[in-house]
Amino acid sequence: MEFIQRHIENVKEKKNFAVRLYRHWVDRTIPYTTYRWLTVSGLIALFFIRILLVRGWYIVCYTLAIYLLNLFLAFLTPKFDPSVEQAMKDEEIEEGVLPTSKDDEFRPFIRRLPEFKFWYSSMRATLFALVASFFRIFDVPVFWPILVVYYLVLSFFCFRRQIQHMLKYRYVPFDIGKKKFGSH
């Protein structure tokens, strides 16, 4: 019995060491944003080339594309929805509460899905899809042009809604052209 407990403890220690080592290497990639995204882009390109060459696993490809679209929309969406804030302001006006802030007050754009989590989830999903494309069980026969049309229609409606939301509440989720302070 003591031997089994020591063996279980040894396995747990090795697992914890492997998890810590994995987290260490993932955490070391944080400052290298460009290289991280180039790696994910390369993996996605490799996956799509594989799908085109083997002419199969279209469901896996469609699932990955939908998941990446969902992640991207969460990346573009603010953490605190301005429509909810606007409804609360309207309710305060009706109740007669004194204003506590100005409309022109600076409010930083905080994403619902931070960039690192977006990258990490994209990387894991792409690796999972790449591995799944090697197993015949995931090669479900489907007419792929329908999946492409579904994806394009879904993307169109999602992006249209997101752009309308951005225009209505006047926020820009990108920091291109904004001043950067610090050691950048």
UniProtKB/Swiss-Prot annotation:
Topology term for the membrane: Multi-pass membrane protein
Gene Ontology terms: biological process: endoplasmic reticulum to Golgi vesicle-mediated transport; intracellular protein transport; protein retention in ER lumen; retrograde vesicle-mediated transport, Golgi to endoplasmic reticulum
GO cellular component, one term: Golgi membrane
Keywords: Membrane, Transmembrane, Transmembrane helix
Residue ranges crossing the lipid bilayer per the database entry: 34-54, 56-76, 137-157
Subcellular location: Membrane
Database matches in PANTHER family: PROTEIN RER1
Family: Belongs to the RER1 family.
Name of this protein: Protein rer1
Organism: Schizosaccharomyces pombe (strain 972 / ATCC 24843)
